[in-house]
Amino acid sequence: MGKTKHQGPISTTKLPQPKHWVSPVPFGLGKVKPKHIRDTMKVAWENKDNLGYASRILTQGVCDGCALGVSGLYDQTLKGPHMCTTRLNVLRLSTMPAIKSEILHADIDELRKYDSTELRQLGRIPYPMIRRKGERKFSRITWDEAMDMIANKMKKLNPKQYAFYLTSRGITNESYYVAAKVARFLGTNHIDNASRICHSPSKTAMKRSVGVGASTANYQDWIGTDVLVFWGSVASNSSPVSTKYMLEAKKRGTKIIVINPHREPAMDKYWIPSNLESALFGTKVADDFYQVSIGGDIAFMFGIMKHWFEMEENQPGSAINHSFVKEHVNGYEELKTHAKAQNWDEIEKSSGVTKERIIELAETLAKSKNAVYTWAMGLTMHSFATDNISQVANLALLRGHLGRKHNGLMPFRGHSSVQGSGEMGADPFVLPGGEFDEKNRERIEKVWGFEIQKWQGDIVGVTLENIVLPEEHERKVKLYYMSGGNFLETMPDPDFVKKALSELDIRVHQDIILNTSTLVDAKEAVIVLPAKTRYEQEGGGTSTSTERMVYFSPEIQGNKNEIKEARAEWKIYVDLAKRVKPETAHLIDFKTGQEIRDEIAIANPNYNGIQHLKKKGDVFQWGGAWLCEDGICPTPDGRANLIPVEIPDFGKKEEQFVLTTRRGKQFNSMIYKEVDPFNGAGRYDVLINPEDAKELRVADGEAIVVHNGFGVFQGKAKFADIARKNLGVHFPEGNFLLPRGRYEKYAGIPDYNIAVYVEKAERFNARKDTQYQEKEIADDLDISPPA
């Protein structure tokens, strides 16, 4: 899709630039900031029983934390070693010993006293286990017993009645691919992955806008572009090494713009531990913040476009790249008419930003020859998320910010190799190399040698709802096979999720650790299978980064705490398939990771090159340095598409707030610090604008209640620089306020934003009888979910 190859890592600017310093006072003394040196020493202490193996993981393996793709200590963006706390925090998952048997086989209610953080710290799952209906403890079983029980159950079920789910906690492309193939081999299309609750709208929107659901740019494009826009992203928190790229970009003249309801401290200033200058004096990251209200991004972008078209009336070519649009873009006149028809009053009301401020950014972008637009959960976790992303693409296309150096669209991924999950086919809407459509299905059937069922598989949220369907329904899910994941802490309406998980006949947890969902009952049995980490996978494996770099991570020897009964994830899937359909097992019987990579290169032509990755440091980038290079997109006519979208109605009443969930110091739902080191917020603190708190007569730190017709959240007010009538609570603690069944209309992502009421706890508790409070909230206040 692009002819230019990535140039490899570049050198950093050596001379200090004090204008980017936070303070001349060294080490951020007196500032609220992470304690990186202390945290690093703590990690070393935690891994002291397996320090050699931990060191080899860090120096030889590909990071299993975020999606930057650091291989060993190096990457393809900047020369020099890289290390971050995200990677260090997940390190212990690969080095720790097994859970002690007296804890593992304790009464289930004793295990349920642990939260997920405490369960994670107990150690790894040592061997296959089962807990049948009515049993109070997990019992050890053999692999044969476990796999036969799962296979025999599947043989009795309609394939529409079992499902697979994979989450990206270090899962390799090989495992994703085999899982996708095995699911279809067994006759089910119910397979989904963690991107369903993060970036599925990005893929959907980019496919319709530019023809490809992946980043069109690479990280080096940040460095030297005129403007780098972060939309709904706290990249410095989720992927700390990215701050090195930001610092280098600033030194080369890049202006960094952050668009987010909350002025995230980590995007304001950061101390980069692996850069001496930044570690000493800090780095001022963002040059400007635009605090758009939750759900107001589409209106905000319409304001930018509206001003561009007003600029064009006075001076043609002052805002729109007409040559690029004429040669490479469809739908210009339709979008122009639609944008000009938008009303400034509605734009300001929806976005929460004044016309004057919107015009500032519009003119900045209009003057910028180059720009990279990157975004994350702040744009994708909405019921209108696909439209959010298409609107970002509209901005880039109108300016011609696509398909060349220092330009592009970049969905900022948060999990290692989650980019590869869909590209390997572990998604109900895709198969390797393309969509789940007739043409691609027939192509893959020839590669795989068996027929693929034509019916549409379900997304994870619908699969959970299908568990509670009537017994006779053909899509009532009775067996759920999960590689990692904890739906109790990632999906809306945790009470319903717990009920659904308990109504499965058999639930399989293939994982390295226990979590709270593992301890939920099932109607027949809960089966737990010990998986190997990516560093233990025989022959190594690959992972795909945000920028489409496919890295080889070698098998790393010498684990003193080796889990002898753990198996590579892809091998477990192969074993299952052979037991369910032994008569055609030869079609799925991979023996090595190399065999899998050889087939991936055929099944997904973009991955032609993966078969040559064999040792540490091996890497290739599918699609070249820039997708849509020279404006030529992988669409039927080779042109990009401008998509007119509508400003969404959030359904908020005047007295309500809009609440969003946010991450603190955590990796996905795995929490590593109870207090956010960037802003001092505890897990049950509610970020609120001081002016809003004043109107509610609430003091900083005072107990408040956030409620709606779906749930109640009791916390404390935490004054923060957040947009008016917006609230922030931590994920997953705030998930009780989110109802099930509200999905993004194109990609099926759950909506993680909701309208709520806020009041002092003493007033709430005085007004509501505890026994009936949720019923009374719904009845007395007549609350309905937002549209």
Regions found by a protein language model. Give the residues of each.
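Long, well-ordered, tryptophan-enriched scaffold segments
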Residues: 96-110, 119-120, 253, 267-368
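Extended redox/cofactor-interaction regions of prokaryotic respiratory oxidoreductases
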Residues: 121, 179-246, 252-276, 396-525, ...
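Glycine-rich phosphate/diphosphate-binding loops that line cofactor/substrate pockets in enzymes
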Residues: 146-162, 217-226, 249-252, 338, ...
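Intrinsically disordered, low-structural-confidence terminal and linker regions
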Residues: 1-69
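Low-complexity, highly charged intrinsically disordered N-terminal segments
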Residues: 90-137, 147, 174
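N-terminal leader/propeptide and maturation segments of large enzyme subunits in energy/redox metabolism
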Residues: 105, 109, 132-136, 287, ...
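Active-site phosphate/pyrophosphate-binding segments
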Residues: 304, 328-461
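Long, contiguous, secondary-structure-rich segments that constitute the structural scaffold
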Residues: 54, 556-613, 676-687, 691-787
